[in-house]
């Protein structure tokens, strides 16, 4: 029987599942809307092939929430023992919550498959560069998946990996280890979510909206009329309905973030993942600008996070002690 390693990306636009059999490249198997998972559960919401992969997996690596309570890849049952939330002490963070993640975690626990939670990238990670410790949080755990896939494909161990979709998050990899990055609420916006500007701060202080509400609508949607604010459809609307000009605006902002990190940390290559990596107009602008700062600019599949998490699941099953400089917590 073929061994199957599964990655599950609990993202803004849905829960994505990929699998890796130890040969070739990981394969994206399907996606389930978060609202549907919250109502029906993960397995009943996935396409058949993805459901079977989850049920038959030798090892699963997944992300859930911000991941700030974890500093290692942690067995699911150990993370749950930490309490309420992710890690599982705290699910609170940025973005809209539907309850799908908690339902997913509970279901996987009952399934009995070996499953590991990916930690977030935050100031308590031992390998984090000191400059990034000024920020409490740099990225949630699925970005480790995106970085793992990029390293698998890259000819360099010094790269910037950017995931741009509902939001934009960039991660710096030096000597094959994640040392920092820029979170969605700090740097370039995505389609739906983005940093808090002066207008947002004033509205928050005036009690007109919450900080999370400001972040959740801080992306390029606030200045364009071609995409709405539904987290499960905003990105596809942007790709299908917005023109070259709007895509160029966003691409310039993403390029600003990625190029800055690349110059400061002397990185050779830039790898772009997330749903927008599949849009030719957006990527054309990004590649043209970033080629001035990097020896190579390449796109990753839109499902790169789940695919990379599947590779990490295989690393864990093979007995690796760490991935990307992040330790793996082993059962006694």
Swiss-Prot record:
Pfam families in alphabetical order: DUF1464
Domain of life: Archaea
Coiled-coil stretches noted in the UniProt entry, renumbered to this chain: none
HAMAP family: UPF0285
Family: Belongs to the UPF0285 family.
Official protein name in the record: UPF0285 protein MK0078
Organism field: Methanopyrus kandleri (strain AV19 / DSM 6324 / JCM 9639 / NBRC 100938)
């Amino acid at each position: 029987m073929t061994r199957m390693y599964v990655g599950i990306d609990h993202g803004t636009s849905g829960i994505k599942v990929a699998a890796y059999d130890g040969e070739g490249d990981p394969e994206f198997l399907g996606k389930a809307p978060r609202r549907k998972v919250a109502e029906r559960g993960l397995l009943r919401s996935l396409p058949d092939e993805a459901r079977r992969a989850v049920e038959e997996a030798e090892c699963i690596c997944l992300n859930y929430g911000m991941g700030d309570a974890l500093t290692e890849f942690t067995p699911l049952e150990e993370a749950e023992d930490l309490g309420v939330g992710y890690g599982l002490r705290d699910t609170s963070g940025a973005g809209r919550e539907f309850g799908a993640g908690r339902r997913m975690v509970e279901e996987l626990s009952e399934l009995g498959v070996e499953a590991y939670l990916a930690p977030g990238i935050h100031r308590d990670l031992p390998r984090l560069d000191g400059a990034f410790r000024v920020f409490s949080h740099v990225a949630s755990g699925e970005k480790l998946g995106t970085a793992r896939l990029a390293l698998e494909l890259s000819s360099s161990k010094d790269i910037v990996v950017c995931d741009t979709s509902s939001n934009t998050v960039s991660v710096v990899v030096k000597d094959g280890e994640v040392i920092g990055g820029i979170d969605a609420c700090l740097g370039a916006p995505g389609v739906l979510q983005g940093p808090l500007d002066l207008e947002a701060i004033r509205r928050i202080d005036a009690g007109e909206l919450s900080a999370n509400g400001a972040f959740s609508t801080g992306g390029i949607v606030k200045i364009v009329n071609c995409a709405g604010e539904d987290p499960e459809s905003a990105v596809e609307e942007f790709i299908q309905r917005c023109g070259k000009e709007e895509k160029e605006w966003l691409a310039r902002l993403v390029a600003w973030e990625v190029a800055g990190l690349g110059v400061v940390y002397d990185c050779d290559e830039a790898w772009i993942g997330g749903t927008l990596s599949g849009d030719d107009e957006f990527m054309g602008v990004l590649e043209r600008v970033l080629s001035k700062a990097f020896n190579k600019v390449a796109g990753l599949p839109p499902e790169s996070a789940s695919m990379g998490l599947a590779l990490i699941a295989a690393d864990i099953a093979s007995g690796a002690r760490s991935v990307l400089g992040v330790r793996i917590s082993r059962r006694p």
